[in-house]
Amino acid sequence: MKYKKTMGCILGGLLLSAFLYWQDNGLMLTRMNYEGDIPKAFQGYKILQVSDLQNKVFGKKQKPLLKKIKESAPDMIVITGDLLDRHEGRTNVDSAMELIQEIMGIAPVYFVSGNHEHQSGEWDVLLDKLIDAGVTVLDNGKSIIEKDGDTITLIGLADKSVNPYYHEMLHTLMAGQEERFNILLSHRPELFDTYVEENIDLVFTGHAHGGQIIIPFLRQGVFAPHQGFFPKYTEGMHEKDGTVMVVSRGLGNSSFPFRIFNRPELIEVTLSAK
């Protein structure tokens, strides 16, 4: 009897370990479709979102992650912050750049910072390396994307932790862009009402880590930074007054070491005209 109990505990421990490993490492490519007033040339245009890697490594030289990105075959790759992890002993700029150097050959890459970049003490180092690699860093900036004579505006906000006047900054960046289809990259989903107020068409965000633990069947996250317990914006698409916000569950972990019913994800959004 004692032997059976011991073996049962061992088996249970192994199954739990396997489950937690799969939850943390079982990469997903989540495909979404956005319908809106898309310029004709951008019909079918694919945007691949990478968020909240937090210095996590998926196999040797990020091969499983790269395989998923290549599978998407995107027209554009957007990174919405927290490529680095701020915690002592985990911040590794060179490791983060390993992924960047590989994806530069897949599609143009656009980046905005998250709170971890600025809290790591390595932001200036990472910024220089991103620019040297050919990444377009859009912290409080914008870029006009042209395709076959049509254009869209891509806007980026630096993280709120170093950008306290983010609303005023976004208002300034949007000036003169009202008639052009616009996309915003921002780390923070909890600022959704600000994005709505500025009439952004499509927003890509992260930061919430999917609520870390998702309650099955309810699809309710338990906790997200700057939203607290049972947060509203942790994953998926959210729409309000014509603004659509995409929230990535992200790829890595930080303060809390596990994901439960919340596998790491890349997001692919295909643009479609109504």
Please report, for each region that a protein language model flagged, where it lies by residue:
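N-terminal membrane-anchoring alpha-helices
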Residues: 1-41
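Extended recognition/assembly regions associated with phosphoester-bond processing machinery
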Residues: 30-36, 173-185, 244, 251, ...
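Membrane-embedded segments
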Residues: 45-138
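Active-site metal-binding loops of divalent metal-dependent hydrolases
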Residues: 50-55, 81-83, 115-117, 141-142, ...
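Conserved acidic residues
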Residues: 75-77, 82, 180-183, 201
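Binuclear metal-dependent hydrolase catalytic cores centered on His/Asp/Glu-rich metal-binding motifs
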Residues: 121, 128, 132-135, 147-186, ...
